Curated annotation (Swiss-Prot):
GST C-terminal domain sequence ranges: 14-65
N-acetylalanine PTM sites in chain numbering: A2
Keywords carried by this UniProt record: Acetylation, Cell membrane, Elongation factor, Membrane, Protein biosynthesis
Cellular compartments per GO CC: cytosol; eukaryotic translation elongation factor 1 complex; plasma membrane; plastid
Region (Disordered): 75-139
GO terms of molecular function: translation elongation factor activity
Compositionally skewed regions (Acidic residues) per UniProt: 95-115
Keyword Cell membrane found: yes
Family: Belongs to the EF-1-beta/EF-1-delta family.
Function field: EF-1-beta and EF-1-delta stimulate the exchange of GDP bound to EF-1-alpha to GTP.
Domain of life: Eukaryota
Full protein name: Elongation factor 1-beta 1
Start-end of Basic and acidic residues biased regions: 116-138
Length: 228
């Protein structure tokens, strides 16, 4: 019976592979078959010590594949999606995986991808892009100084006006009132932003010092700006 593996770039998928390989040397028995090559292609890297069965299997398949291609490799990197099968290598019928007299050299490395394999390849690419995007989306800690119009400005409402500004990637933090002189106080307030989502200049010009918040806020200055 055919076995289906999915999400082999995730811990859940590797756990399924680990359980399947318990007591087995290869995917479909004690001999390497095209099934192993297909699953191997869907695993991003050696699963590691957390998956001993899968890790041992991965190294074994890698060793067999290396022996199948004795030529010296300089090492290459391939970008983009999965390429369609080359016309120079037409699809051939896969031998039945009966385990009797199978030869590693007979494995068809150029067989057409199944729907599950295409889906797995797409999921791997999506996972890589999500990981890259997460790494690139840094955060910053910003300290703002918010000044009122005069000593008659209601500072409680001023702070409420500041915190009323909400947008994706913006989190308001601690604040305090600092005396300036002549009965006037200013508000200092911390905020954390996701750099790719929030522009501090836009936040100040288009939200904090524009209507209706400019009824309480005269100006806003950046006191400190630090990457997290």
């Amino acid at each position: 019976m055919a076995v289906t593996f999915s999400d082999l770039h995730t811990e859940r998928g590797l756990k399924t592979l680990e359980e399947h390989l318990a007591g087995k040397t290869y995917i479909s028995g004690d001999q390497l078959s095209v099934d192993d090559v297909k699953v191997y292609a869907a695993v991003l890297e050696n699963p590691g010590d957390g998956f001993p069965n899968a890790s041992k299997w991965y190294d074994s398949v890698a060793s067999h594949l290396a022996k199948s291609f004795p030529g010296k490799a300089d090492g290459v990197r391939v970008g983009g999606g999965v390429a369609p099968p080359s016309e120079a290598h037409p699809h051939t019928e896969e031998p039945a995986a009966d385990g009797d007299g199978d030869d590693d050299d007979d494995i068809d490395l150029f067989a057409d991808e199944t729907e599950d394999e295409k889906k797995a390849a797409e999921e791997r690419e999506a996972a890589k892009k999500d990981t890259k995007k997460t790494k690139e989306s840094g955060k910053s800690s910003v300290l703002l100084e918010v000044k009122p119009w005069d000593d008659e400005t209601d500072m409680k409402k001023l702070e409420e006006a500041v915190r009323s500004v909400q947008m994706p990637g913006l989190t308001w933090g601690a604040s305090k009132l600092v005396p300036v002189g002549y009965g006037i106080k200013k508000l200092t307030i911390m905020m954390t932003i996701v750099d790719d989502l929030v522009s501090v200049d836009n936040l100040i010009e288009d939200h904090l010092t524009s209507e209706p918040n400019n009824e309480y806020i005269q100006s806003v200055d950046i006191v400190a700006f630090n990457k997290i």
